[in-house]
Amino acid sequence: KEVLSDKTTMHHLIEVDPVLSRVSVHLANFLEIPFDVYPKDAIMPLPLEEADVVIGDFPIGYYPVDERSKEMKLGFDEGHSYSHYLLIEQAINALKGAGYAFLVVPSNIFTGDKVKQLEKFITTETEMQAFLNLPPTLFKNEKARKSILILQKKKAEVTKPVEVFLANIPDFKNPQQFQGFITELNQWMDTNHTKK
């Protein structure tokens, strides 16, 4: 729990891997940021209040607990469901209305034979804000490349559709290109998220 002026911030971490959970606790202690750590499967029902922001870096693969995936909108009718689809749904379910999700996902997430189900969920439940491809130099190959997907949970009379910000984040070693990207992002923010 952290107090920022008149707001209290709670940090929660959900990690199924016990080693990564312990590393996260040590990192939080080092940074002096208090975290509640839940060493559990993030696709199972969560014991948390709705959040203003969810940040996630999702594993790619199949989720083996078919009983749980069948309870979810992004679960497949047959066979194992994609864990990254289920984690997107879980992230949105964990948000308050108008809350934001910042999710690291495979860059090719909007391709494949099951993508219509994901697209329907995103358009029904959220306002997509941005899809930012991370620099290719961060990954061994194009197949491993990831992107940042930014979604806002819909809330009647609060959220509104925006022009989705699509961009390739330039290599961090090129300051001029990176500054150009930041300028573009700021312009998009000014146009689509003006303070009232």
Please report, for each region that a protein language model flagged, where it lies by residue:
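Domain-level detector for long C-terminal conserved domains
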Residues: 75-80, 94, 121, 152-156, ...
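General small-molecule cofactor/ligand-binding pocket signal
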Residues: 36-40, 132, 167
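Conserved nucleotide-binding/hydrolysis micro-motifs of P-loop NTPases
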Residues: 59-62, 108-110, 138, 155-156, ...
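Conserved S-adenosyl-L-methionine
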Residues: 1-56, 61, 107
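Local beta-strand N-terminus motif with an aromatic residue
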Residues: 50-52, 128, 146
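Mobile active-site "lid"/loop adjacent to the S-adenosyl-L-methionine
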Residues: 57-87, 108
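Conserved Class I SAM-dependent methyltransferase catalytic core
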Residues: 80-138
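Flexible, glycine-/basic-rich loop-and-beta segments that form/coincide
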Residues: 143-196
